[in-house]
Regions:
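Ubiquitin-like/PB1-type beta-grasp interaction modules and other compact soluble beta-rich domains
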Residues: 1-83
Length: 84
């Protein structure tokens, strides 16, 4: 996990391709709702498409849009996976 007023962000599969990177450290001075953070990410990279379809995990636990991201967290962003 990151320390201080940052979060460690991991991007997987198509999300990483659209972002052009697999990992970055982002500043985060105060807690933020995951949905708000995802919305900001979609604005930053419109190629991701609607933020509502993206999935995330905080500190290796799958969470929904109402979860809270806090400084020091590790956030993983990925697309839904289906099988069949």
């Amino acid at each position: 996990m990151a320390t201080g007023a940052t979060i460690e962000v991991l991007y997987f599969a198509q999300v990483a391709e659209h972002m052009g990177l697999r990992h970055e450290t982002q500043p985060l001075d105060a807690p933020i709702q995951a949905g708000d953070w995802l919305d900001a990410l979609a604005v930053r990279c419109p190629a991701l498409g609607p933020a509502a379809r993206l999935k995330l995990a905080i500190n290796q636990e799958h969470v929904g849009r109402t979860a809270t991201i806090r400084p020091g967290d590790e956030v993983a962003v990925f697309e839904p996976v289906t099988g069949g």
